[in-house]
Regions:
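ABC-type nucleotide-binding domain
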Residues: 369-612
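Conserved catalytic Walker-motif region of ABC-type ATPase nucleotide-binding domains
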Residues: 140, 262, 350, 377-379
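Pre-NBD coupling/linker segments of ABC/ABC-like ATPases
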Residues: 359-370
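Helix-loop-helix
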Residues: 89-94, 98, 191-205, 279-348, ...
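An intracellular "coupling" helix at the cytosolic face of ABC transporter transmembrane type-1 domains
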Residues: 51-52, 145-146, 162-171, 175, ...
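Juxtamembrane helix-loop junctions of ABC transporter transmembrane domains
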Residues: 31-39, 62-63, 70-83, 106-153, ...
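Membrane-integrated ABC transporters
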Residues: 1-71, 86-99, 117-121, 125, ...
Length: 612
């Protein structure tokens, strides 16, 4: 596993060396800055995303021109041969040989030029595609926890995968198709005006028709694409939710209800997709029919000019070929508009994330090199967005360095909110949360969290091995340290029973392990960081009685000298806590040792009696 990761990193470095520009800021930040500097201008944003690779596009254009030379020269050669034959030129045969060799040479030139063109173009477009995804991932790591709570993960996944793919498709179409269109039209018009101004003027008459067709449908296309994109994001989120909840729906025999609910969502997507398909079909067919009629008119017009002696007979094939080129290329623009509209909408969709200001701002704040673990909650109030009711009401709490504090209370009392304040996920609406006497809102949380370890209520494992999950984010972990943590987390027997031991794959989200096993790995991951502050959100809830007892003993030893916050509904698990804080109505209703609170016979006593 480790070798493969090193190989992946090496491959990424090689690719970045070929594609990444030498910039003062990292690639992800540079992409975000491109969006910020071009807000409201998706095409300008797209162009700036490639700014660092303009030189590759220039080389690609040169190669593109060289590889298509055979196509542009062939109509001229054909017309010249016909004119030589019809005029009985004595050098006709020699000219045919010369033209054939010239065309054959240009055809063979296509092979190396196409390879070089694809190489330059692909490096530039793949760089942008990778850069956008990295920028999105970096931004998602910076966005506040409240943003992630309010935004469905399926929508974010859709932006990272589907929208970036659409932007890459837009880039390819703009470069490959638009470049092809521009050069084909340019060459055709230059050759035409050099031979006949009358025919050139006729060619220009097709432009207004193309413009009218495009303007008519552009606004409709934009609206339909926006509706379809949002519906797809909603569907992606619903599908992800459905997959995660399959065990719940199966356990309660709700399969039919879930299928019916998803069917409604899928039909909504189908309806919007159908309307989009109709618009695209109408758009394409109207454009095609209009330009085909003009092509027939061109044939009649050039034939009339040849009869009048204003052009040679061979020139009819030249103009017909070039007119077909102009018509087909302008028609291609019309056909491309749906793809362009979809890509532009995806550029805007990505911007919704990259330009979000709901981020955790650590710039310019004080960095914490050391943490002792003293906490003070001074008159803290907090409420969640779209909810005027305060979860915490003037909370006051003092926690000494090295103390183990247990937070108890009914569901919704504010226990998890306090933990989120300790971690820094939430910030107090009023009052202060102090860490070692420093306002937590004024410190660089990234430096603070290096001294923090969290075991959440729901164990979260990453795809990979048990070793990868325990040592996640830690470098140079010795085997001795690892074995110590494994023993403390009661994982020794589990690992010994597995054929591959620590190198056993855990599956997606740890699906190959039981809930208790996953939780113990999460605890081991927290312990190996040797933190100064530990947050345990019902960390023993998923363990059986025997494992819970062993883990509790290990935690008592390992939390010594570290400030520890514990949330537990089972009050028997917190008997050894230094202090117990009873949270009720967002306040600290009672605070003391287990014995003190039992003797008080207040709220803690009542909770204990209920559980007994």
């Amino acid at each position: 596993m480790r070798r493969s990761r090193k190989g992946m990193k090496s491959g990424m470095k090689d690719f970045e060396a070929k594609t990444s520009p030498r910039q003062k800021m990292d690639t992800e930040s540079w992409f975000i800055e491109c969006y910020r500097n071009n807000q409201g201008h998706p095409l300008r944003t797209l162009i700036h995303l490639y700014k660092a690779n303009y030189h590759k596009f220039v080389m690609a254009v040169i190669c593109f021109f060289a590889k298509h030379a055979c196509v542009w020269v062939l109509p001229i050669i054909t017309a010249n041969i016909i004119n030589d034959v019809t005029s009985h030129n004595p050098d006709t045969f020699r000219n045919i040989i010369f033209y054939s060799i010239l065309e054959a040479g240009l055809i063979l030139l296509n092979i190396p030029m196409n390879y070089l063109y694809t190489s330059y173009k692909s490096l530039a477009t793949r760089y942008a595609e990778t850069g956008l995804r990295k920028a999105l991932i970096r931004k998602l790591q910076q966005l506040s926890i409240s943003y992630h709570v309010e935004t469905q993960s399926g929508r974010l996944q859709s932006k990272i995968m589907r929208d970036v793919e659409a932007v890459e498709g837009l880039s390819t179409q703009l470069f490959l198709s638009i470049l092809n269109i521009a050069l084909n039209i340019g060459v055709a018009l230059v050759v035409t005006i050099s031979k006949s101004r009358i025919v050139f003027i006729f060619f220009l008459l097709t432009t207004p028709v193309a413009a009218i067709t495009m303007v008519t449908f552009r606004n409709i296309m934009k609206k339909r694409n926006t509706e379809f994109r949002k519906e797809m994001e909603e569907t992606s989120a619903r599908v992800m939710e459905m997959v995660e909840l399959v065990p719940v729906t199966r356990a309660h025999a709700l399969e039919d209800e879930e299928v019916a609910k998803m069917s409604g969502q899928l039909f909504a997507v189908a309806e919007k997709g159908y309307k989009l398909d109709l618009i695209q079909a109408l758009f394409g067919s109207v454009g095609w029919a209009v330009f085909q009629i003009f092509q027939v008119i061109c044939l009649a017009f050039t034939g009339y000019l040849a009869i009048g002696g204003k052009i040679q007979a061979g020139d009819i094939t030249l103009y017909q070929s070039y007119f077909a080129t102009v018509v087909n290329q302008v028609s291609s623009i019309v056909t491309l508009l749906p793809t362009i509209a979809k890509g532009i909408e995806s550029v805007n969709s990505i911007g919704e994330v990259l330009l979000s200001e709901d981020i955790e701002d650590n710039e310019g704040k004080e960095k914490l090199e050391q943490v002792t673990g003293t906490f003070d909650f001074e008159d803290v109030c907090f409420h969640y967005k779209n909810n005027e009711h305060n979860v915490l009401n003037h909370l006051n709490l003092h926690v000494k360095s090295g103390e183990t504090i247990a937070l108890v209370g009914e569901s919704g009392a504010g226990k998890s909110t306090i933990l989120n304040l300790v971690i820094g996920f939430n910030q107090a609406e009023s009052g202060k949360v102090l860490i070692d006497g420093k306002d937590i809102s004024k410190i660089d949380l990234r430096t603070y969290r290096k001294h923090l370890a969290v075991v959440p209520q729901t164990s979260i494992l990453f795809s990979g091995t048990i070793r990868d999950n325990i040592t996640y984010g830690c470098e140079n972990v010795s085997e001795e340290e690892l074995q110590k943590v494994i023993k403390a987390a009661n994982l020794s027997d589990l690992i010994a029973s597995l054929p591959k031991g620590l190198d056993t794959m855990v599956g997606e989200h740890g699906g190959k392990l039981s809930g208790g096993q996953r939780q113990r790995i999460s605890i081991a991951r927290a312990l190996i960081r040797d933190p100064k502050v530990i947050v345990l959100d019902e960390a023993t809830s998923a363990l059986d009685s025997i494992s819970e007892k062993l883990i509790q003993q290990a935690l008592n030893n390992l939390t010594e000298g570290r400030t520890t916050f514990i949330v537990a509904h089972r009050l028997s698990t917190i008997r050894d806590a230094d202090r117990i804080a009873v949270i009720a109505d967002g306040r600290c209703a009672e605070y003391g040792t287990y014995e003190e609170l039992m003797a008080l016979q207040g709220e803690f006593y009542q909770l204990k009696q209920i559980q007994s």
